[in-house]
């Protein structure tokens, strides 16, 4: 069903609002993917706070005009699904992970910090650990010396207690 002018303007405004707050935009070709699989992809995207939408390319081009993602307009050809996220790696991770299990989803391009990336760039971005993963690793590294010191003190106290009991 064709969209009327007001509907198109509403779609462009909605997508432009998402793009304005985004750090990353990923484009992927979805030709031949079953509806059930696309539903799973959308559910995974929602979990990760990724705005995922199939758009007409002309509407997407209008939505990215005047933004750091404008250079992506050249890549907007064919049936594309757009992943947009405020998190730097979430969109790339969701699309890349789904692409590993479904070979019909083909990453075309992406943009991060105003730079256009090819498929390899999007995959490299997706392989970076998330902020939460990095923070948990940092916390572990910071806690390791403290917990080791605490265990050493406990062992020393236990040893002294054993000596006092034996004496």
Swiss-Prot record:
Q: Transmembrane segments in this chain: where?
A: none
Q: Does the keyword Transmembrane apply?
A: no
Asked whether the UniProt record includes Amino-acid biosynthesis among its keywords, one would answer no
One GO CC term on file = ribonucleoprotein complex
SUPFAM superfamilies, per the entry: Ribosomal protein L10-like
Q: Which Gene3D superfamilies match?
A: 3.30.70.1730, 6.10.250.290
UniProt keyword list = Ribonucleoprotein, Ribosomal protein, RNA-binding, rRNA-binding
Per the record, the GO terms for biological process are:
translation
Name the family the entry cites: Belongs to the universal ribosomal protein uL10 family.
Q: Which NCBIfam families match?
A: PRK00099.1-1
Assembly and oligomerization: Part of the ribosomal stalk of the 50S ribosomal subunit. The N-terminus interacts with L11 and the large rRNA to form the base of the stalk. The C-terminus forms an elongated spine to which L12 dimers bind in a sequential fashion forming a multimeric L10(L12)X complex.
Q: What does this protein do?
A: Forms part of the ribosomal stalk, playing a central role in the interaction of the ribosome with GTP-bound translation factors.
What name does the UniProt record give this protein?
Large ribosomal subunit protein uL10
